[in-house]
Amino acid sequence: MSENKQPEQNQDLTGEPSPEELEAAQAADEFDAMNAASEAQAQLAVLQAKNTELSDNYLRAKAEAENARRRAEDEISKARKFALESFAESLLPVLDSLEAGLNMKEATLEQLREGSQATLKQLKAALERNKVIEINPVAGSKFDPHQHQAISMVPAAQEANTVVAVLQKGYLIAERVLRPALVTVAAPQ
């Protein structure tokens, strides 16, 4: 028995694909396109979710920063208020002493002097507690333009640009000049 292969009846002898092959290829292309589209849609959904998450995180961080700024402003405001309150409270004993001195009807000059000295001592203590420090340069010390204000230059036997006399004490508060000391300075010779 001889087996002869006979060409299939549907086979195209021209070398071009048959309609069934074209249909199968087209179906495969459509399937690949559908897979690519569904993958793209899945990636898009993932990216949209990530975008939403990042947007939410940004808004939360922005709100948290705004809240932190408000809290800081409130704390600064309270610190100023309470610092002023503390300073005023430390001056109340001085006020009490001055009022008591003024209420004395038959005070002697010596009693007034002692009362004034005690009140001055109270005032200096209150200023020290609140970090107000006296600037009182000694004669002959170097002139410091950051803490001293020269009122005049006078001829003196000491080195030029040194303090000759203090006309009015200055004050620092927390290492910042509240008022410079008014001084006379030795003139160059």
From Swiss-Prot:
<feature type="region of interest" description="Disordered">
    <location>
        <begin position="1"/>
        <end position="35"/>
    </location>
</feature>
<comment type="function">
    <text>Participates actively in the response to hyperosmotic and heat shock by preventing the aggregation of stress-denatured proteins, in association with DnaK and GrpE. It is the nucleotide exchange factor for DnaK and may function as a thermosensor. Unfolded proteins bind initially to DnaJ; upon interaction with the DnaJ-bound protein, DnaK hydrolyzes its bound ATP, resulting in the formation of a stable complex. GrpE releases ADP from DnaK; ATP binding to DnaK triggers the release of the substrate protein, thus completing the reaction cycle.</text>
</comment>
<dbReference type="GO" id="GO:0006457">
    <property type="term" value="P:protein folding"/>
</dbReference>
<dbReference type="InterPro" id="IPR009012">
    <property type="entry name" value="GrpE_head"/>
</dbReference>
<dbReference type="GO" id="GO:0000774">
    <property type="term" value="F:adenyl-nucleotide exchange factor activity"/>
</dbReference>
<dbReference type="GO" id="GO:0005829">
    <property type="term" value="C:cytosol"/>
</dbReference>
<dbReference type="GO" id="GO:0051087">
    <property type="term" value="F:protein-folding chaperone binding"/>
</dbReference>
<comment type="subunit">
    <text>Homodimer.</text>
</comment>
<dbReference type="InterPro" id="IPR000740">
    <property type="entry name" value="GrpE"/>
</dbReference>
<feature type="compositionally biased region" description="Polar residues">
    <location>
        <begin position="1"/>
        <end position="13"/>
    </location>
</feature>
<keyword id="KW-0346">Stress response</keyword>
<dbReference type="GO" id="GO:0042803">
    <property type="term" value="F:protein homodimerization activity"/>
</dbReference>
<protein>
    <recommendedName>
        <fullName>Protein GrpE</fullName>
    </recommendedName>
</protein>
<keyword id="KW-0963">Cytoplasm</keyword>
<dbReference type="Pfam" id="PF01025">
    <property type="entry name" value="GrpE"/>
</dbReference>
<dbReference type="GO" id="GO:0051082">
    <property type="term" value="F:unfolded protein binding"/>
</dbReference>
<dbReference type="InterPro" id="IPR013805">
    <property type="entry name" value="GrpE_coiled_coil"/>
</dbReference>
<comment type="similarity">
    <text>Belongs to the GrpE family.</text>
</comment>
<keyword id="KW-0143">Chaperone</keyword>
